[in-house]
């Protein structure tokens, strides 16, 4: 079995890149030949509102490698990346870890943010940590959302990483019967961390990519995170963040009390960074996630999640069993207070969260992938 993987190669890596690498590695261990194909030439002088079209043309440039790619049994890409190969006879699988339409629906303009969150953005702008309150245009995102829909319609099969992603796709007219929900997995090393002693005093922990532009910052709920951190000035806080915005990182260091930050840490070094916070509280403040690897990663290290209802969270978190799902900042504050005052509850939920994360070992994901491939090639 030969699989052609089509995706982008980025300097600061996102969940999609890590998942692509993990899938390819584990498929090779099962004897599958997997070859990666990356477009090489991106137009650099196009105006901002052409960015979506630019990305689409970027992947069409792979047609120069069409003979090599078409020698594979299956062509798989992330959302619209296999676009150029939809018209050929080879089966195409489009893998959706999230949807751009989901982003667009979840992220309001800054002046419409809830419960004081707008004020956080105004302060960041005033201090120079961010340059603008809203992105100049959503046209590129709308272009990408349209082409994602087109790619999903034309692909032979679509993989969705959660029920939220599946529902996004059904909502734009993709047939439910061609969508296979296959949850993401986390790397094996997340399960190799020795059990740590659970501390009586809890730390508030954030793990994840926060981005640089105002749209991504709102998508990832950085304003919510800052607001929650500021409600607990005396509590220790630790963040592992992926971002190229040095001014924002410095602002978070300087203005959030009792807060330490690790920036752009090497992925396999993160379990060791989190180990001493086992029994602490992990905050997931995003307005939209397709899956949220960082949620599962935090749970695997014995952190108790308090998460908004995004990504995989509503499928795996059970209130007062292994964490809490919340819908407002006030509710999140209430749950944080509950856990801070009740170490016994926090320790019980910590152990349950760690057990829940074991569902997301890579073996389960790869078996489902292989079953889908065999079905396609029957």
Question: What kind of region is each of these model predictions?
Answer:
Residues 116-158:
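Membrane-proximal helix-turn-helix segments that form the acceptor-binding/catalytic region
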Residues 170-171, 176-177, 181, 185-202, ...:
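Acidic anion/phosphate-binding donor-loop and adjacent secondary structure
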Residues 197-220, 226-230:
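Conserved donor-binding/catalytic core segment of Leloir-type glycosyltransferases
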Residues 249-281:
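Nucleotide-activated donor-binding/catalytic signature segment of Leloir-type glycosyltransferases, i.e.
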Residues 281-284, 304-307:
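Short hydrophobic beta-strand element within catalytic cores of glycosyltransferases
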Residues 287:
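Aromatic "clamp/platform" in nucleotide-sugar-dependent glycosyltransferases that forms part
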Residues 319-330, 338-344, 358:
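Conserved acidic donor-binding segment of nucleotide-sugar-dependent glycosyltransferases
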Residues 338, 345-359, 367-371, 375:
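A short, well-ordered alpha-helix in the C-terminal region of glycosyltransferases
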